[in-house]
Amino acid sequence: MQAIILCGGLGTRLKSIIKDIPKPMAPINDKPFLEFIFEYLKKQGIKEVILAVSYKYEVIKEYFKDEFLGIKIKYSIEKEPLGTGGAIKETLKFVKNEAYVLNGDTFFDIDLSKLKLNESKICLALKQMNDFDRYGTVNVDEQDLVISFEEKVFKKQGLINGGIYLLTKDIFNDFALQEKFSFEEFLQENYKKLKARACIFDDYFIDIGVPEDYYHFLINN
């Protein structure tokens, strides 16, 4: 199975910490955050990774080259940032049938094999959260089909999009899309057509997009 990692983020909120490098290369003691994702994917049995890169991608390529930890690497290079949707769409030319998609700035320690498509074009990994206002929430029915998305408001309890997906190569085929678009917005607008389903996890999750969580991951690794 192949995995796509989205590495094009500018890391605006981490600028004071990581200076002038791509966000997934944020240093965690003696190695970049992205290396933790590679270690995780190796344990999950992934043999090939496609890195969707843009800003200062040379820094990533210099470190990981064309193979890392026995995982083959291909690079999908965006001359201009295409948004998460545009980046995924561009990488799908490297995908055979289906692929996992992960954010390069989040770590979600789930068992990837539990994500199942069945008749759907996409399966989302959702994280059970308590007392939060930083994320929007996702609602599912008893068949694990996505039935709605909610905006960011304080929630005592809810399910958030954990930033890992299993999707088909042809997920975008029936849609007229701009070159640059947000995958999250695409999902919110089209989850019914995609028959989007979800799998709920309670495993360790962290998003290093803000300094507080970056330092938390740094201290614990």
Curated annotation (Swiss-Prot):
It catalyses: D-glycero-alpha-D-manno-heptose 1-phosphate + GTP + H(+) = GDP-D-glycero-alpha-D-manno-heptose + diphosphate. InterPro entries: Mannose-1P_guanyltransferase (IPR050486), NTP_transferase_dom (IPR005835), Nucleotide-diphossugar_trans (IPR029044). CDD domains: NTP_transferase_WcbM_like. Keywords: Capsule biogenesis/degradation, Carbohydrate metabolism, GTP-binding, Nucleotide-binding, Nucleotidyltransferase, Transferase. The keyword Nuclease does not apply. It comes from the Bacteria. GO terms for molecular function: GTP binding; guanylyltransferase activity. GO terms for biological process: capsule polysaccharide biosynthetic process; GDP-mannose biosynthetic process; nucleotide-sugar biosynthetic process. This enzyme is used in a preparative method to synthesize ample amount of GDP-D-glycero-alpha-D-manno-heptose to be used in elucidating biosynthetic pathways of various heptose components present in capsular polysaccharide (CPS) of C.jejuni. Pfam families: NTP_transferase. SUPFAM superfamilies: Nucleotide-diphospho-sugar transferases. Gene3D superfamilies: Spore Coat Polysaccharide Biosynthesis Protein SpsA, Chain A. Its EC number is 2.7.7.71. Pathway: Nucleotide-sugar biosynthesis; GDP-D-glycero-alpha-D-manno-heptose biosynthesis; GDP-D-glycero-alpha-D-manno-heptose from D-glycero-alpha-D-manno-heptose 7-phosphate: step 3/3; Capsule biogenesis; capsule polysaccharide biosynthesis. Catalyzes the GDP transfer from GTP to D-glycero-alpha-D-manno-heptose 1-phosphate, yielding GDP-D-alpha-D-heptose. Is able to use ATP, CTP or UTP as substrate in the presence of pyrophosphatase, but at a significantly slower rate. Can also form GDP-alpha-D-mannose from alpha-D-mannose 1-phosphate and GTP. This is D-glycero-alpha-D-manno-heptose 1-phosphate guanylyltransferase.
